[in-house]
């Protein structure tokens, strides 16, 4: 493997706390005490991960009458009772099976209880149990706790299992550099990666966004004999697409001998991510021709981005024939499709027929009515349905108020956003308010919103809204201030210069018009 300048993190965690974990477990103190007492020496023996155990059968039988989680809880409670009575629990198969069940159910609290039941010598001497414990913590978002267990595994170099789990845990948390550091540490420790290592580390690489690192890992996986493994190559396609090299992504895609639905969806998503709709539609057609059904995520992405209404209608028909019209993400995308084409009746019909709705559904239908007051009616329905709006919801309703001149409603909603829903205003919300006041001719209020009420430095969208309002209402003084800030923030945006020229033209200030035009010439902008 090749080396890379990614500093391995220093892992020293004296305690488990909210500052050191991505999630705070209920058994904080138990974990802390457990780690202090659990390990005394090293020396592990391997245990087959697939060794049969009676515990799954026990849980399966109990699941007939109770949920799996209740059955798991019952088994652990029985074992805890036995331990309290001094009955020795030494069967590794039981603990391995319980950890497997906790992992499959993502039952981290139950996993902590199992962790407490494992005898210290068994945890020290059984690589299989330690590895499963690492996987459980890592998969549930406790990568740092998993790393503590991992650091005490003396023979962890005998298998990539625990390494893979920890790499995956960091990658899922967005700690991509930590995941990459572990991968390169594997090479230093002489641990041979397997087909499960590469998809995990490629995900981390895609998060970092480095094609150079990705190419190095590509060479590694070919050297290790996985150059034609569809599972690995699918991850490679995603990595190159996320790192910005869609050509390499397509080259890898074309190399896959037996493409599965993940291969096709990965390439389709990659094209959509890069805005290459024509290429995405070609992949979509090829998928259908090859008998591969695009998943609902891919279908939703295509529907939301398709430019031709004819193509959109054809896709809608295709969706109906496959009975997918009322899949939540697909229905949401159809609302966007029809509303963008001005087909509000069809968009409303789909929304009204939906069996379930999420925030995206409400946002889509509210945004569809951004030019009329009906959007506020949907917002009120959303409130009555106890659906929780988000920042996007308020961008839509505030834009609606600006477009329709509903100043008081806009002010009320802006206040409601933070006071009732706890959503802190962001740049786009302030831009909406400036637009609201500006369109209504309330220039002083618009300017005051920027210089007195904003808790952050105004960006181009905010100053741009103010400059446009100055153009609409012929306010030269504030317009000059807004233009000057925009010239500093966006020195190459000729639209800002053109708006100032129009403001001066309205005011019949010919000399200032020529001065701004000369500024454009000096900066190499078109006039």
From Swiss-Prot:
Alphabetical list of SUPFAM superfamilies matching this protein: TPR-like (SSF48452)
UniProt xrefs under InterPro entries: E_motif, Pentatricopeptide_rpt, PPR_At4g14850-like_plant, PROP1-like_PPR_dom, TPR-like_helical_dom_sf
UniProt keyword Repeat present: yes
Cellular compartment(s): Plastid, Chloroplast
Tree of life domain: Eukaryota
Region (Type E motif): 462-527
Organelle transit peptide residues: 1-47
Keyword RNA-binding carried by entry: no
Family: Belongs to the PPR family. PCMP-E subfamily.
Designated name of the protein: Pentatricopeptide repeat-containing protein At4g25270, chloroplastic
Species of origin: Arabidopsis thaliana
Gene that encodes it: PCMP-E53
């Amino acid at each position: 493997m090749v080396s890379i300048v990614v500093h391995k993190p220093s892992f020293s965690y004296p305690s488990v706390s909210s500052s050191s974990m991505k999630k705070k477990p209920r058994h904080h103190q138990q974990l802390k005490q457990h780690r202090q007492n659990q390990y005394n020496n090293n020396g592990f023996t391997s245990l087959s991960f697939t060794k049969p155990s009676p515990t799954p059968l026990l849980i399966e039988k109990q699941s007939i009458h109770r949920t799996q989680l209740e059955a798991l809880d019952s088994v652990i409670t029985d074992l805890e009772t036995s331990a309290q009575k001094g009955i020795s629990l030494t069967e590794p198969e039981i603990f391995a099976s319980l950890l497997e069940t906790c992992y499959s159910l993502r039952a981290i609290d139950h996993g902590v209880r199992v962790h407490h039941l494992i005898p210290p010598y068994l945890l020290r001497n059984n690589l299989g149990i330690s590895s499963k414990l690492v996987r459980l913590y890592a998969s549930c978002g406790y990568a740092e706790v998993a790393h503590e267990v991992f650091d005490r595994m003396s023979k962890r170099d005998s298998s990539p299992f625990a390494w893979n789990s920890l790499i995956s845990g960091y990658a899922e948390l967005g700690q991509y550099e930590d995941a990459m550091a572990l991968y390169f540490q594997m090479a230093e420790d002489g641990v041979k990666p397997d087909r499960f290592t590469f998809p995990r580390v490629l995900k981390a690489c895609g998060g970092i966004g480095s094609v150079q690192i990705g190419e190095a890992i590509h060479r590694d996986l070919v050297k290790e004999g996985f150059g034609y493994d569809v599972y690995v190559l699918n991850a490679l396609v995603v990595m190159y697409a996320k790192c910005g090299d869609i050509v390499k992504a397509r080259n890898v895609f074309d190399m896959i001998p037996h493409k599965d639905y993940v291969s096709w969806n990965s390439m389709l998503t990659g094209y959509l991510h890069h805005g290459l709709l024509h290429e995405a539609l070609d992949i979509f057609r090829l998928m259908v021709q090859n008998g591969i059904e695009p998943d609902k995520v891919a279908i939703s992405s295509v529907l939301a981005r398709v430019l031709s209404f004819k193509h959109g209608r054809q896709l809608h028909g295709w969706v109906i024939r496959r009975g997918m019209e009322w899949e939540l993400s697909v229905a949401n995308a159809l609302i966007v499709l029809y509303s963008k084409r001005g087909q509000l009746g069809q968009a409303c019909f789909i929304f009204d027929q939906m069996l379930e709705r999420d925030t995206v559904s409400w946002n889509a239908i509210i945004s569809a009515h951004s030019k009329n007051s009906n959007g506020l009616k949907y917002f009120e329905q959303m409130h009555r349905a106890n659906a929780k709006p988000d920042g996007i919801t308020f961008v839509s309703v505030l834009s609606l108020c600006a477009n329709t001149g509903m100043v008081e409603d806009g002010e009320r909603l802006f206040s409601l956003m933070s006071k009732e829903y706890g959503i802190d205003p962001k740049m786009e919300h302030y831009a909406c308010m400036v637009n609201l006041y500006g369109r209504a001719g309330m220039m002083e209020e618009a300017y005051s919103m920027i210089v007195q009420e904003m808790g952050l430095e105004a960006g181009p969208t905010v100053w741009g809204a103010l400059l446009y309002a100055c153009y609409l209402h012929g306010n030269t003084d504030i317009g000059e201030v807004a233009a000057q800030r925009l010239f500093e923030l966006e020195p190459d945006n000729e639209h800002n210069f053109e708006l100032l020229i129009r403001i001066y033209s309205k005011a019949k200030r010919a000399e200032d018009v020529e001065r701004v035009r000369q500024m454009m010439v000096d900066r190499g902008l078109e006039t």
